[in-house]
Amino acid sequence: MSAKDMIRTPAVEDYSKAIFSLESRGDEPVSTNALAERLGITPGSVSAMLKRLDELGLITHLPYRGVRLTDDGRRIALEVIRHHRLLESYLAEALGMPWDRVHDEAEVLEHVLSDDLEELIAAKLGHTTVAP
């Protein structure tokens, strides 16, 4: 297992994606409570994970204000979001899965999509850059 693989757990990816989404709503750092609400977990659990993300260099902690993704954290978030969107499109368009099911399936599969399969799916979809 590479160092990259040890950092890239589903939890790290989910947190990065959630922080990215909350950051995109405004200029303020993301608070522990906002992140806990977004992920449906307790603020205590969020605090423990934020400490880990900070140690990994994926976030910058601003005391009493919240957190922001670093460039590395943002790269992870954007890659997971791309995986998710490609998978949603592929599941619906190529496999005919109903749209009311594709999001939940993509949530699971986004964490295990290899670079090779990502490229094949993108090619199959015509290298789409539009979110479904």
What are these regions (language model features)?
Residues 50-51:
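Short, hydrophobic-biased segments on the C-terminal half of alpha helices
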Residues 6-41:
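N-terminal helix-turn-helix DNA-binding core of bacterial DNA-binding proteins
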Residues 29-31, 70, 87:
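Residues that mark the N-terminal boundary/hinge immediately upstream of a DNA-recognition element
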Residues 65-84:
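Basic, amphipathic "hinge/linker" alpha-helix immediately C-terminal to the N-terminal HTH DNA-binding motif
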Residues 54-62:
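A short, conserved structural fragment
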